[in-house]
Amino acid sequence: MEPAAGFLSPRPFPRAAVPSAPPAGPGPPANASPRSEPEVLAGPRAPDPPGRLITDPLSGRTYTKGRLLGKGGFARCYEATDTESGIAYAVKVIPQSRVAKPHQREKILNEIELHRDLQHRHIVRFSHHFEDADNIYIFLELCSRKSLAHIWKARHTLLEPEVRYYLRQILSGLKYLHQRGILHRDLKLGNFFITDNMELKVGDFGLAARLEPPEQRKKTICGTPNYVAPEVLLRQGHGPEADVWSLGCVMYTLLCGSPPFETADLKETYRCIKQVHYTLPASLSLPARQLLAAILRASPRDRPSIEQILRHDFFTKGYTPDRLPVSSCVTVPDLTPPNPARSLFAKVTKSLFGRKKNKNKNHSEDQDNVSCLAPVVSGQAPASLIETAAEDSSPRGTLASSGDGFEEGLTVATVVESALCALRNCVAFMPPAEQNPAPLAQPEPLVWVSKWVDYSNKFGFGYQLSSRRVAVLFNDGTHMALSANRKTVHYNPTSTKHFSFSMGSVPRALQPQLGILRYFASYMEQHLMKGGDLPSVEEAEVPAPPLLLQWVKTDQALLMLFSDGTVQVNFYGDHTKLILSGWEPLLVTFVARNRSACTYLASHLRQLGCSPDLRQRLRYALRLLRDQSPA
């Protein structure tokens, strides 16, 4: 932490009135980060915490001290409850021994004076403060779900819609601060607190300062190493642009799993920051990479303003959920963008097919409404998929789920856990071997993905099954498939709803999606080879063709999860493939570099081992599945 700008004479601690009403909304604890993020100027470890009861010596009001929420260089933060009103707070406890010197006390006064008058939905609310002979107590809004650092520690990476959700709130709070002439100077995951209803609040104003003209700015280096801007390290002063830089580091950390300039050595980290030396993973969407590249620029003048950031394609063309589920604190949420056309169509189809007809209901009125919504469905079919299919896109797609799972299949979580358990059991006990055991002589034909196209930067993920059925998992979570004979269209508005239409009777609201599906089919037919020599299976022989529930791309492979429990992993480098199917017993099909395919019983692999080539891919598949598991 940094001493307050300037040295003022010590003065008595002002005392704020104790509120008679609870603070608006739940609110945050103190500085708590899952990684070791030492502040550049930090004091020694705080002494032992105070007793269980905190008493205001002037008013006599008492508070029960609860659990520790977080700790920093100068203070600890606890949950505290007013014994009379029952209102819960986060109380920041600063030992008097830490503010014995005038400049130390001035620092705390500066924090209080900057924070106490801030009133904004995305700023931690300051309630009141007092002191006794042992400590200074600052009472703040309590955020029951801790900080974004805790979510990041549990999740490691977040989806782009989640990152947009949190960044919009951070930008809102930061814009308010800058408009009031306040610089935060320590924006990091541990200082973004999450309320009970999943709202974000910017907190911890221990390093905050008033904005000064460039020539009058203090040159002190302050902040957290991984998030410090290059001009701060070069002692050029701290302006609003340095907060924007820190925000870019936060965005990168949430999307990529680690800060952009993090190294094992602090000096090396600072060198990377000064030289703006970092990498942008290809797995990020193009707008995300463009925004990060715009923010993380060496010159403060070249960085975008908050308004420009909010107008960037990353925010304007990407889906931002209105609210995140609480489960997203620990596991990947199932996010489905709203689609007015789909919602109305689901309502109409339910009216037409899903229940008894109401004699008093005018069905033609609803049908007219559906036809009017055709332009709402996303976009026109691409003029040339060849030119755009290689564009980078979102690394993940998921079919919408109503919570009950696919009616005749499994949920994503069930598929992941079943495959994870079976594969872990196989790999863990597999003895060393140099070659594969004998494959099954006549394995049952299986349905697998023979071709695929990732066009999710605009439309969705297209694939062709070995049965010649072609399908698209659209970005809005809907799924549409074309039968092998190209005469029937299958539409899944959610994972629990399924409708079939003849080609000539597809509703107008679905025509744009059908157009995109047909373009995908045409492109794959004309430009892609079948991915392996496996026995084909006729679609008529498949009672319920599997539905793609989720796909995930990494820098090495593509993972696909299906409603019948099938798991397929395609490796980019050598075009090998791994398919897990059957389950009773589990079958492992390996498509080699020469496109030849062999199917093995997983139990045989466990007993006899397999070649290093196959073992390596089984282990990578296991790692991919672990990454998708909420456990």
Swiss-Prot record:
Keyword Lipid biosynthesis: no
Pfam family, one: POLO_box
UniProt keyword terms in alphabetical order: Apoptosis, ATP-binding, Cell cycle, Cytoplasm, Cytoskeleton, DNA damage, Golgi apparatus, Kinase, Nucleotide-binding, Nucleus, Phosphoprotein, Repeat, Serine/threonine-protein kinase, Transferase
EC numbers: 2.7.11.21
PTM comment text: Phosphorylated in an ATM-dependent manner following DNA damage. Phosphorylated as cells enter mitosis and dephosphorylated as cells exit mitosis.
GO terms for cellular component: centrosome; chromatin; cytoplasm; Golgi stack; nucleolus; nucleus
Tissue specificity statement from the Swiss-Prot or TrEMBL entry: Expressed in skin.
Effect of loss of the gene: Aging mice display increased weight. Cells display defects in the G1/S cell cycle checkpoint and CDC25A protein is more stable. According to a report, they also develop tumors with the highest incidence in the lung but also in the kidney, the liver and the uterus. However, increased tumorigenesis was not observed by another report. The differences observed might be due to the different mouse strain background used in the 2 experiments.
Active site location: 186 (proton acceptor)
UniProt-annotated binding residues for ATP: 69-77, 92
Keyword ATP-binding among UniProt keywords: yes
Domain POLO box: 448-526, 547-630
Catalytic activity: L-seryl-[protein] + ATP = O-phospho-L-seryl-[protein] + ADP + H(+); L-threonyl-[protein] + ATP = O-phospho-L-threonyl-[protein] + ADP + H(+)
InterPro entries in the record: Kinase-like_dom_sf, PLK3_STKc, POLO_box_1, POLO_box_2, POLO_box_dom, POLO_box_dom_sf, Prot_kinase_dom, Protein_kinase_ATP_BS
Protein name: Serine/threonine-protein kinase PLK3
